[in-house]
Amino acid sequence: MCVKNDYDILLVVILFWAIFKQNGTALTTYAEQYTNRNIPESMAPVANKLGFAETQKYAKDSVWAKDAQFRKLKHNQSPYKIWDYPDYFKNDANTSDYPMGASLQLWNTEIFQSINPFFVVLFTPLIIVFFNWLRKKGKEPTSATKIAYGLFISALSTLVMVFAVYYSSNGHVKSDAVWLITSYAVITIGELCLSPMGLSMVSKLAPLKYAALMMGGWQLATSIGNKLSGVLAKNWDVFTNKALYFWLNFGLLMLAFFILIVLLKKLNRAFTTD
């Protein structure tokens, strides 16, 4: 029975990682193509010295022909090039302010990958203090309940991106970086509620002779989630309305959340018995 409970946890974990791991795929694409990455002039020297900046020249060049959603256009089944401005300026509302040939300083797309680790360091002690405070008041949720909270909070992060798409008119104008940063902040809180608790429950619920096996199962679930994340991200260009893509992510996380809610009493009982 304990092993069966572990399987239940691993199932919802797969769906969580499938969404979370899109920080290296869909969210990076959103940062590159749909996010305003202009660096304020006052910060540009420091950003350059730290290697956080890239230069984009506002001048026409030979570029791939793309539609409004940055999908390559084809002629006779083959992509083709046109004489136009770089992709970054396709949905930049400020192009009228740029002199021809101007060099803009932009935040590297890769910088957004560091947001999650930054928030992990920032939020971890705060969450520990919060749960310790609840424990002293006798109101600390169970490990399974924390995982459920983590799934729900993570789902909210995808709603942030839905609003970002609406705010930017489905990418016709660039959205503020604050949307992406907020989404990372929210899903990091969800990660800190779910990942440590899930790993702890899997190890504690498994019989001693299966402990190593179930720890391997956790890694396998993470791996499957990574694969599913890639499958989802591969279909990014299928969605003309990018809000629908993030609604799909929201739906998958809420599915995992409701699955866990249904199993919550059984998991809490098994954990208490253990």
Question: What are these model-predicted stretches?
Answer:
Residues K209-L213:
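Conserved short cytoplasmic inter-helical helices of the MFS fold
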Residues M1-Y184, T188, S195-L199, L205, ...:
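Disordered extramembrane loops and terminal tails of multipass alpha-helical membrane proteins
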